[in-house]
UniProtKB/Swiss-Prot annotation:
Protein name as it appears in the record: Ribosome rescue factor SmrB
Molecular function terms from GO: RNA endonuclease activity; rRNA binding
Organism: Klebsiella pneumoniae (strain 342)
Matches recorded under HAMAP family: SmrB (MF_01042)
Enzyme class of the recorded protein, top EC level: hydrolase
Domain Smr: 98-173
Primary gene name: smrB
Length: 183
């Protein structure tokens, strides 16, 4: 770092003389944004509670009536069938991916609950759940579990680029996002 050269007394006096009669200019062109509050991390206990709250909807005894012909699909009664068509065409790109390969049914339920909680918390509308082929247990159970959850609007077999018949694209109902209020 360079040392500042100090001005001689003569130069300082000359500078003061030249600056007499001047006034400070008020800065009015740049508006500074107010300081935003730091976003606090969600407590781990709360994350576990959200995961448990979302996974308790999944029952192995209840079998929702799903269309077994053709590709795996479901649309909630209050949701437009056009949303299902958009899912099928790949109009929605998933922002979160969940891979259930190698998990037990209980672990898969917990992970599905965690995915739904994360999507709602992060305002993610579309996610991809990869259940794989395997022994077809998770492939059969995953759509049945998803159809039971109240925040699942629709799901459809994923297009080839997202896993084809070994994955599902899921539309999740998220709360309306509100921007933070400025002080």
């Amino acid at each position: 770092m360079k040392k500042k050269t100090s001005l001689s007394e003569e130069d300082q006096a000359l500078f003061r003389q030249l600056m007499t009669g001047t006034r400070k200019i008020k800065q009015d062109t740049i508006v500074h944004r107010p300081q935003r509050k730091k976003v606090t991390e969600v407590a781990p206990k709360r994350l576990l509670q959200e995961q448990a709250d979302n996974s308790h909807y999944f029952s192995d005894e209840f079998q929702p009536l799903l269309n077994t012909e053709g590709s795996t699909k479901y649309v909630r009664a209050d949701v437009s069938h056009f949303e299902l068509k958009k899912l099928r065409r790949g109009d929605y790109s998933p922002e979160l991916f969940l891979d259930l390969h190698g998990l037990t049914q209980q672990q898969a339920k917990q992970e599905l609950g965690a995915l739904i909680a994360a999507c709602r918390r992060e305002h993610v509308f579309c996610a991809c759940v990869m259940h794989g082929h395997g022994k077809h247990i998770l492939k059969q159970q995953t759509p049945l579990w998803l159809a039971q959850h109240p925040h699942i609007m629709a799901f459809h077999q994923a297009p080839k680029e997202y896993g084809g018949d070994a994955a599902l694209l899921v539309l999740i109902e998220v709360e309306e996002w509100q921007p933070p209020e400025l002080p």
